Every structure is written in C-alpha cells, then in structure tokens.
C-alpha cells in the first residue's frame, strides 16, 4: 500500500513549529586486534552511540544556478521543470504524455515505512523530511554561449518537437550570463560556441561570479542558492605544491593569475567565499586540495564528482551483485559512443582522460571487500572506451562485457547493451543533487559526547548515490556500491525523524 505522507509518533521525536528533533541510537561495530591469551585475534565489538538530530522544517525559496545552463542538461532540466509547473502535456507517436519527474530519487521513488494488517506500507522518498518543491525552484546560470534557452533546447534535440513548441514562449527570453572560458581546459572544438565570456584576470572572474550570484539572489528574492557545474568536462588540473595544495596557496595563485587554476575551480572558490553550496557534475578534479581546505574552513557544502546516470550506475549494481554472490569479475570492458556536445568535447584526449578515471574507479571498494576472490593488489582488467558519433546525438549507447570466474574454473560472460538518453537521465539527477544539498544545510546533529549541534562535514559524502566518483573527506572510505549509497542517504534522513534503518529482517513474520 502507498501513502502520501506520515508523521512519526515516538518518545524520541518531537515536532515543533519550525523544527523536528529526534534522538537516534546509532548501532555500529568496531574491529580491534587484541592479545587474547597470548595470541592476537580480531575482535568485533558492537557499540551504540546516541545522536540528537535537529531539522529546520522551514522550506526556503531556492535558486539554482547552473554552470553550462545552455547545454543539453541545463536546457533539458529547465524545460522539464517548466513543463511540470505548467502542467503541460504533448503528443508523442505513442500517446499524450504528461510532464513528470521520473528518474528523480527525491520525486519519484519510495521508502518502506512499516506494515499495516500484514501489508507493506510505502511512502514517497520526499515525505521523510520537508523538501523544496522542484516546481518552485528559480533557475539561473552561466554559459559561454549566448544562445537563449529555447534555441538551446532545440539545438540539444532531446525533447519532442510538440513539447518544444509549447515551451518556447517560456524560454526564448532566457539568456545565460557570460561564463568563464579557458580553452586550455576543454577541447578546441568548443571554441566556436564561446561568444559569451567573462574577461579579465582569474581574480576578476571570481569577483564577477560573486557579483552575479548576489544579483541573482536579490533579483529573484530567493532565500538560498545552490550552484552546480553541468558544463564541459575539463582536463585534470595539475596539483602542484605552492600552487593549489593548500587554501593559502590556491588563493595566492588566483591573485597571481596562475594559468593552472581551472574555470570550475574558480566557480567553486566564488561559491565557498559566498557560503553557497557547489556541486561538480563533471569528472575533472575541480576540488583540488586547496579548495577542499577552503570549503572546510568556511564550512560550505561541496559535492561531486560526475553525474552517475547510465552505464556506471549499472556497473555499480552488477559488480556489487557478482562479488556479493561469490563470483569473481576478471575483465570489465565498457564501450560508449554518443553524439552530443559532451561526446564532442570528450573526443579530445585530455578531457577523455578525466572521464576515464571517473568511470574506472567505480568497482574498487567492491573488489577490496572480498579477500576470498581477490588477492591483495589484484584487480579486474578494466577498460573504458568513449567515441564521438554525431548521428546518435543525445542517445548514448553503452555496451559492456563482464567476464567472471565461477565454480571449478568455469567462466561466465555477461554482455549488456544500454541505450542511455543522456540528458533525460542526467536532468533529474541534477534536481536531486540540488534539493539534497539544500536539505543538508537545514540538518544539524550532535553525538552524546558533543556539547552543541553542528552541520554535516562540508564534503557531502551523502550525495554519493548520484555521482560516479564520490568526493569524500580525507580518511573516509569511498563507497561505490549503489545499494549501500542509497541506504546511507535514506537512513540519514530516517534518523532525522527517529526511524530505524531499514534492515529487511522482517522478524515479525518469521
């Protein structure tokens, strides 16, 4: 059975006019290596830590600024939100289609809340805590092309023509702000688009981005702003001692107009200085060590890297299944071809390398989890290929071959073909990222040993379900298994209303 909303009734939960207070027993285990009767043994010790959570239930008016607003993702997301807000329907060859938010974790997925008369009860994911309604989001942003959003939507060739015709009046007067352009960081073939750029030194560019964000917030009377990079993949930045390895060196490098500071890092610096969350939706190393230091010092949320939408999401599920089933993946070969501007930009070797790194590391934690299958240092052969084929446009093809060792030296091969409508998969992920980043800024917590409430760590690990290469704080394990990532996010929000993690034991029926 599905219910639209619910309220938790528990001595551990208190609802006030503006807040939800919850007391939560976090049950975990720690492993120690101890001398027991003269021999060292691994000892697993269960422990319980009591946490207090405090969630501000006042939902703000949210502004979202996209870097690369006029690209396929930005124009598709903007069009989709307008279509939902206006209740637009359109004719396809199959039926009359209604606007929806399918593909969004927050808007179109559900969570189990319990049972009623022997029937499982489910509720919308978004009903856990008060979230911003995507229909109410105000969009803005930057692009190195001055094409209006209606023409950008047409150029992208993602949405049906009937829908585009209905959306044009809403979008034809929307023009992105000038963006930061540095041809050294993206493919040369992007130069023809760059007619809408911010001039000046890197310090002047950062100052302009700050000015843009302040004016956007004031003009639209929004309470909060979240910025997300959905522009071209950049090449990797070189991390150099004295340049970008510390907060001080990074800021001094901006002042000196050092060439190795990328545009995405400049946007992120501007956001951190303004106290605005910044999310990187591309695979490059935007978050150099100095930028992470800056975010931690200023306690500003940063998240990334790279939207996890198609092939990589499937890979993080399938490899988790194989390793969890005691099957040993020995070879993973992933081939992609796509024809949109992302594919065109990735045709340059330096930008492809950023994507290759992002896609290749997705199985590492799952392999490391099973010392029965894999010796120390052993790893499956893993190859990623991406080719630009203009004809297929935004309809990316992903073909994967998984070869594994099974019982008694046998071999198993799984071949998968996945047609990924690139921007239609990415757009709802962008929506989830900004909505979850916003709600994260309204949650505070403390352990029983801490005196006062504090926010989550600025490096937003809980967004990892939505990213290929999750950004984590120093010393934190990287988790790529999709089921674990979703469970982490759901269980944190469940804790905010005093609900236990979903353990799927259903002992009441045993």
From Swiss-Prot:
Its cofactor is NAD(+). GO terms for molecular function: inositol-3-phosphate synthase activity. Key enzyme in myo-inositol biosynthesis pathway that catalyzes the conversion of glucose 6-phosphate to 1-myo-inositol 1-phosphate in a NAD-dependent manner. The keyword Ribonucleoprotein does not apply. Belongs to the myo-inositol 1-phosphate synthase family. Pathway: Polyol metabolism; myo-inositol biosynthesis; myo-inositol from D-glucose 6-phosphate: step 1/2. This is Inositol-3-phosphate synthase.
